[in-house]
Protein backbone atom coordinates (compact mmCIF):
# COMPACT_ATOMS: atom_id res chain seq x y z
CA UNK A 1 0.00 0.00 0.00
CA UNK A 2 1.23 3.50 -0.71
CA UNK A 3 -0.36 5.21 2.26
CA UNK A 4 1.39 8.45 3.33
CA UNK A 5 3.98 8.29 0.57
CA UNK A 6 4.57 11.75 -0.85
CA UNK A 7 5.93 12.64 -4.26
CA UNK A 8 5.49 11.25 -7.73
CA UNK A 9 7.70 8.60 -9.30
CA UNK A 10 7.10 9.78 -12.90
CA UNK A 11 8.32 6.39 -14.21
CA UNK A 12 11.94 7.22 -13.36
CA UNK A 13 14.59 5.99 -10.99
CA UNK A 14 15.33 8.18 -7.98
CA UNK A 15 18.65 9.37 -9.43
CA UNK A 16 16.99 10.26 -12.74
CA UNK A 17 14.22 12.15 -10.92
CA UNK A 18 16.73 14.05 -8.81
CA UNK A 19 18.81 15.05 -11.84
CA UNK A 20 15.73 15.99 -13.86
CA UNK A 21 14.30 18.29 -11.18
CA UNK A 22 17.73 19.80 -10.54
CA UNK A 23 17.99 20.67 -14.24
CA UNK A 24 14.41 21.93 -14.37
CA UNK A 25 14.97 24.18 -11.35
CA UNK A 26 18.10 25.65 -12.96
CA UNK A 27 16.16 26.30 -16.19
CA UNK A 28 13.31 27.88 -14.25
CA UNK A 29 15.61 30.25 -12.36
CA UNK A 30 17.52 31.08 -15.54
CA UNK A 31 14.50 31.84 -17.76
CA UNK A 32 11.86 32.50 -15.06
CA UNK A 33 9.29 30.69 -17.25
CA UNK A 34 9.33 27.11 -18.51
CA UNK A 35 6.83 24.79 -20.16
CA UNK A 36 6.51 21.20 -18.95
CA UNK A 37 3.92 18.55 -18.19
CA UNK A 38 1.50 19.26 -15.35
CA UNK A 39 2.71 16.49 -12.98
CA UNK A 40 6.33 17.59 -13.42
CA UNK A 41 5.30 21.19 -12.80
CA UNK A 42 3.59 20.26 -9.54
CA UNK A 43 6.64 18.33 -8.36
CA UNK A 44 9.02 21.09 -9.47
CA UNK A 45 7.28 23.41 -7.04
CA UNK A 46 8.47 21.17 -4.17
CA UNK A 47 12.08 21.56 -5.35
CA UNK A 48 12.23 25.21 -6.43
CA UNK A 49 10.30 27.03 -3.70
CA UNK A 50 12.58 25.91 -0.83
CA UNK A 51 15.58 27.19 -2.82
CA UNK A 52 14.05 30.67 -3.01
CA UNK A 53 13.27 30.54 0.71
CA UNK A 54 16.90 29.59 1.30
CA UNK A 55 18.06 32.54 -0.82
CA UNK A 56 16.18 35.07 1.31
CA UNK A 57 18.93 34.87 3.94
CA UNK A 58 22.36 35.36 2.36
CA UNK A 59 25.05 33.35 4.13
CA UNK A 60 27.93 31.16 3.06
CA UNK A 61 26.19 28.08 4.44
CA UNK A 62 22.99 28.84 2.49
CA UNK A 63 24.97 29.49 -0.69
CA UNK A 64 26.69 26.13 -0.30
CA UNK A 65 23.37 24.38 0.23
CA UNK A 66 21.95 26.08 -2.88
CA UNK A 67 25.02 25.12 -4.92
CA UNK A 68 24.69 21.53 -3.70
CA UNK A 69 21.12 21.44 -5.01
CA UNK A 70 21.69 23.28 -8.32
CA UNK A 71 25.38 22.73 -9.21
CA UNK A 72 25.46 26.11 -10.97
CA UNK A 73 27.42 29.12 -9.71
CA UNK A 74 25.50 31.49 -11.99
CA UNK A 75 22.13 30.33 -10.67
CA UNK A 76 23.31 30.57 -7.05
CA UNK A 77 24.37 34.15 -7.74
CA UNK A 78 21.02 34.97 -9.32
CA UNK A 79 19.13 33.29 -6.47
CA UNK A 80 20.87 35.26 -3.74
CA UNK A 81 21.40 38.58 -5.55
CA UNK A 82 18.09 38.90 -7.42
CA UNK A 83 15.42 36.41 -6.40
CA UNK A 84 16.12 36.44 -2.67
CA UNK A 85 15.72 40.21 -2.59
CA UNK A 86 12.67 40.15 -4.90
CA UNK A 87 10.78 37.78 -2.60
CA UNK A 88 12.11 39.08 0.74
CA UNK A 89 8.65 40.09 1.97
CA UNK A 90 6.69 37.22 0.41
CA UNK A 91 6.00 34.30 2.76
CA UNK A 92 5.83 31.61 0.07
CA UNK A 93 4.05 30.86 -3.17
CA UNK A 94 6.88 32.02 -5.41
CA UNK A 95 5.76 29.95 -8.41
CA UNK A 96 2.65 30.09 -10.56
CA UNK A 97 1.49 27.05 -12.53
CA UNK A 98 -0.73 27.83 -15.53
CA UNK A 99 -2.36 25.01 -17.46
CA UNK A 100 -1.87 25.45 -21.20
CA UNK A 101 -3.64 22.63 -22.99
CA UNK A 102 -2.39 19.26 -24.12
CA UNK A 103 0.72 18.08 -25.97
CA UNK A 104 0.13 17.16 -29.61
CA UNK A 105 1.96 13.82 -29.59
CA UNK A 106 0.49 12.06 -26.58
CA UNK A 107 -2.21 14.42 -25.27
CA UNK A 108 -0.31 14.95 -22.00
CA UNK A 109 -1.55 17.94 -19.96
CA UNK A 110 0.97 20.78 -20.24
CA UNK A 111 1.63 23.73 -17.97
CA UNK A 112 3.75 26.86 -17.74
CA UNK A 113 5.71 27.32 -14.53
CA UNK A 114 6.69 30.91 -13.89
CA UNK A 115 8.06 32.97 -11.06
CA UNK A 116 5.50 35.29 -9.52
CA UNK A 117 6.31 39.02 -9.94
CA UNK A 118 8.77 38.34 -12.74
CA UNK A 119 9.61 41.18 -15.13
CA UNK A 120 7.23 41.25 -18.11
CA UNK A 121 10.01 41.17 -20.71
CA UNK A 122 10.23 37.43 -21.36
CA UNK A 123 8.22 35.75 -24.06
CA UNK A 124 6.30 32.51 -23.88
CA UNK A 125 8.05 31.20 -27.01
CA UNK A 126 11.40 31.32 -25.20
CA UNK A 127 10.03 28.81 -22.69
CA UNK A 128 9.35 26.22 -25.37
UniProtKB/Swiss-Prot annotation:
Any Pfam family matching the protein: Ribosomal_L17
Instruction: Enumerate the PROSITE patterns for this protein.
Output: RIBOSOMAL_L17
TM annotation in the entry: none
Recorded GO CC terms? cytosolic large ribosomal subunit
Alphabetically ordered keywords of this record: Ribonucleoprotein, Ribosomal protein
**GO MF terms on file?**
structural constituent of ribosome
InterPro entries in alphabetical order: Ribosomal_bL17 (IPR000456), Ribosomal_bL17_CS (IPR047859), Ribosomal_bL17_sf (IPR036373)
Q: Say if the entry is tagged with keyword Nucleotidyltransferase.
A: no
Its Gene Ontology biological processes? translation
Tell me its family: Belongs to the bacterial ribosomal protein bL17 family.
Q: Its quaternary structure?
A: Part of the 50S ribosomal subunit. Contacts protein L32.
What the entry lists under NCBIfam families is as follows: L17 (TIGR00059)
Protein's name according to its UniProt entry: Large ribosomal subunit protein bL17
Query: Could you read off the lineage of the organism from its UniProt record?
Result: Bacteria, Pseudomonadati, Pseudomonadota, Gammaproteobacteria, Pseudomonadales
